[in-house]
Swiss-Prot record:
CDD domains: P-type_ATPase_K. InterPro entries: ATPase_P-typ_cyto_dom_N, ATPase_P-typ_P_site, ATPase_P-typ_TM_dom_sf, ATPase_P-typ_transduc_dom_A_sf, HAD-like_sf, HAD_sf, P-type_ATPase_bsu_IA, P_typ_ATPase. It catalyses: K(+)(out) + ATP + H2O = K(+)(in) + ADP + phosphate + H(+). This is Potassium-transporting ATPase ATP-binding subunit. Belongs to the cation transport ATPase (P-type) (TC 3.A.3) family. Type IA subfamily. Part of the high-affinity ATP-driven potassium transport (or Kdp) system, which catalyzes the hydrolysis of ATP coupled with the electrogenic transport of potassium into the cytoplasm. This subunit is responsible for energy coupling to the transport system and for the release of the potassium ions to the cytoplasm. It is found in: Cell inner membrane. The active site is at D306. It comes from Mesorhizobium japonicum (strain LMG 29417 / CECT 9101 / MAFF 303099).
Length: 697
């Protein structure tokens, strides 16, 4: 994957197979998927048949007709070539992924004893099987870690050489078939049968086997078909005008007029643009499950961003212990450390380290203490330990206060007095206003104080949000922090809004509320609790390090598990829509120059006054093309060559700029609208001069 990210737009390894692919795509069943080019192929075949008739009978201008036929077929082949190049880039990526898919032997476990396993082919594994994967082993299929912790090399999938940690019981429990365990061991429950793994899906999607036309593509195809029908009718009426004028226009000339006027440029490149949009995401190490998801990213109105890891660096560290009145710092530190002994989060580990550094409190063995760890959940927003009838909890201030109130009522114990609660709230507010996160700590219903966690806003993130605002995108920060902390960080980062103390249900409600207003929403997530929101969002980006449920729910997967990529994904989506719109504008604008090339050539000999060699319609020959035949031939040659010239742009995409919609429209109309008029005038004139100089017409 990493090699492919930097490959050239027109790589020789892709171009050569694409030449053969262009001819294979002449199959009518393949051409029928592109209505415009299918019509071009039909009229090319018709003209070829008429040429053979004239060749046998000796009628017509065989030399001129043959040149028109050659360039008509080149038009079809160039369109096929553009699609074949785009598909070839996907196939090259798929070949790279296939190298990661190796036949492996799996250590199938029948019971709890790790030493008793049976070696079986990885392809024979069924969903629900439990396998042992030890250091040096290849993980045989997708699964969920049910026991153990290990360092895993996922370079075959992500292209990232740094190993990652996979462990049971958290949001880092999902493992991917084809990756390798570097150290320790894990027990894995298989979640995908052979042929249906994440790697298989990646290969299928990257190759384009599952690519379907998006709604925008279908709508544009309908427009192009409509325009084609209009030009069919317009062309069909011309022989009547010619007959009325006492002249004759050959079928070859009518076909040339028809092909140059219909939107062949965008018709030829439309499929390549769609494939290239997904390809650009893959090169960015993001896998889109459909072209619809890429398009939706370009139309996003609201962006939901997790605070931790996206807006901030995500490594919150404990910096201070702030006890309430009547409690010593050491007592607070001891309780906070005890509640964090089994907490493997960066925050939990930093509390243990800070307690040791400040007060020499050493970590204690949970097994010796006979302690039961209470893990953090999105619902309780607390964690802690229970030891011999005693409990210690740390977490969000409101959650800890609610827990203390509930536990004292249940045990008929004395509730904390109002002064202590006010003191705790004052400390928490002070921490929150400084941009920190307050963690309240209690022991057996007694409030002890607050641990100050400090995070840092990423550099340059404020400018990124300003760019999104120019695009018309509203940014919302999602955080579990209290409203004061959230407000301080939101102001520092420059987001438009925030949702504090957010639960998975809150995220889902926010997405539905935005969608009810007609907005398209994008978000990212990695946990099982994010799955409903990922499924509901128009663009749901699941982290590759996340759970199986999250990856199944999202319509994109970020192989690098970098939440900040959501911003780039939106930009890639907008670039796809801009490329399609810009080339459509360019294609339609081309017709103006082609009109001034072919119409005068067709009617130059009509309505000729006595003593004149040309008629009044010759005045439309503003390009001063040499002869009617050279004018028609030049237009048909330009029509074919412009497809080849625009292939790199269709694959690379039009660069998106973070400016207002009005300014962006004006700029694109100037570049691709006016440019679409000027370029054909210049191109057709140059080709006409070359055709005349070579004596081709």
């Amino acid at each position: 994957m990493s090699q492919l990210k930097s490959s050239a737009i027109m790589d020789a390894r892709i171009l050569w197979p694409a030449f053969g692919g262009a001819f294979r795509k002449l199959d009518p069943r393949t051409l029928a998927r592109n209505p415009v080019m299918f019509v071009v192929a039909i009229v090319s075949a018709l003209t070829s048949v008429l040429f053979l008739r004239d060749l046998i009978t000796g009628g017509g201008d065989l030399r001129f007709t043959l040149q028109i036929i050659i360039w008509l077929w080149f038009t079809v082949l160039f369109a096929n070539f553009a699609e074949a190049v785009a598909e070839g880039r996907g196939k090259a990526q798929a070949d790279s992924l296939r190298k990661a898919r190796t036949e492996t032997q799996a250590k199938l476990l029948a019971g709890e004893d790790r030493s008793k396993f049976k070696l079986v082919p990885g392809t024979s594994l069924k969903v629900g099987d439990i396998v042992l994967v030890e250091a040096g082993d290849i993980i045989p299929s997708d699964g969920e870690v049910v026991e153990g912790v290990a360092s895993v090399n996922e370079a075959a999938i992500t292209g990232e050489s740094a190993p990652v940690i996979r462990e049971s019981g958290g949001d880092r429990s999902a493992v991917t078939g084809g990756t390798q365990v570097l150290s320790d061991w894990i027990r894995v429950r298989i979640t995908a049968a052979a042929g249906h793994t994440f790697l298989d899906r990646m290969i299928s999607l990257v190759e384009g086997a599952e690519r379907q036309k998006t709604p925008n593509e279908i709508a544009l195809n309908i427009l192009l078909v409509g325009m084609t029908l209009i030009f069919v009718l317009a062309t069909a009426t011309i022989p009547s005008f010619a007959s009325y004028s006492g002249g004759y226009i050959s079928v070859t000339v009518l076909v040339a007029l028809f092909v140059t006027l219909i939107p062949t440029t965008i018709g030829a490149l439309l499929s390549a643009i769609g494939i290239a949009g997904m390809d650009r995401l893959v090169r960015f190490n993001v896998l889109a499950m459909s072209g619809r998801a890429v398009e939706a990213a370009g139309d996003v109105d609201t962006l939901l961003l997790d605070k931790t890891g996206t807006i901030t660096l995500g490594n919150r560290q404990a910096t201070d212990f702030r006890p309430v009145k009547g409690v010593t710092e050491q007592e607070l530190a001891d309780a906070a450390q005890l509640a964090s002994l089994a907490d493997e989060t960066p925050e939990g580990r930093s509390i243990v380290v800070l307690a040791k550094e400040k007060y020499g409190i050493r970590a204690r063995d949970m097994a010796t203490l006979h302690a039961t760890f209470v893990p953090f959940t999105a619902q309780t927003r607390m964690s802690g330990v229970d030891i011999d009838g005693s409990s210690v909890r740390k977490g969000a201030v409101d959650s800890v206060l609610a827990h203390v109130n509930q536990s004292t009522v249940a045990s008929h114990a004395t509730r904390p007095n109002s002064d202590t609660i006010r003191d705790l709230q004052a400390i928490a507010d002070e921490v929150a206003k400084s941009g920190g996160t307050p963690l309240a700590v209690e022991r057996d219903g007694r409030l002890l104080g607050v641990v100050h966690l400090k995070d840092i806003v990423k550099g340059g993130i404020r400018e990124r949000f300003a760019e999104l605002r120019k695009m018309g995108i509203r940014t919302v920060m999602i955080t579990g922090d209290n409203p004061m902390t959230a407000a301080a960080i939101a102001a520092e980062a420059g987001v438009d809004d925030f949702l504090a103390q957010a639960t998975p249900e809150d995220k889902l409600k926010l997405i539905r509320d935005e969608q009810a207003k007609g907005k398209l929403v994008a978000m990212c997530g990695d946990g099982t609790n994010d799955a409903p929101a990922l499924a509901q969002a128009d663009v749901g980006v699941a982290m590759n390090t996340g759970t199986v449920a999250a990856r199944e729910a999202g319509n994109m997967v970020d192989l690098d598990s970098d939440p900040t990529k959501l911003i780039e994904i939106v930009e890639i989506g907008k670039a796809l829509l801009m490329t399609r719109g810009s080339l459509t504008t360019f294609s339609i604008a081309n017709d103006v120059a082609k009109y001034f090339a072919i119409i005068p050539a067709m009617f130059a000999v009509f309505y000729v006054a006595p003593g004149q060699s040309t008629g009044p319609l010759q005045a439309l020959n503003i390009m001063h093309l040499a002869t009617p035949q050279s004018a028609i031939l030049s237009a048909i040659i330009f029509n074919a060559l412009i497809i080849i010239a625009l292939i790199p742009l269709s694959l690379r995409g039009v660069k998106y700029r973070a400016i207002g919609a009005g300014a962006l429209l004006s700029r694109n109309l100037l570049v691709y609208g006016l440019g679409g008029i000027i370029v054909p005038f210049v191109g057709i004139k140059i080709i006409d001069m070359a055709v005349t100089a070579l004596g081709l017409a």
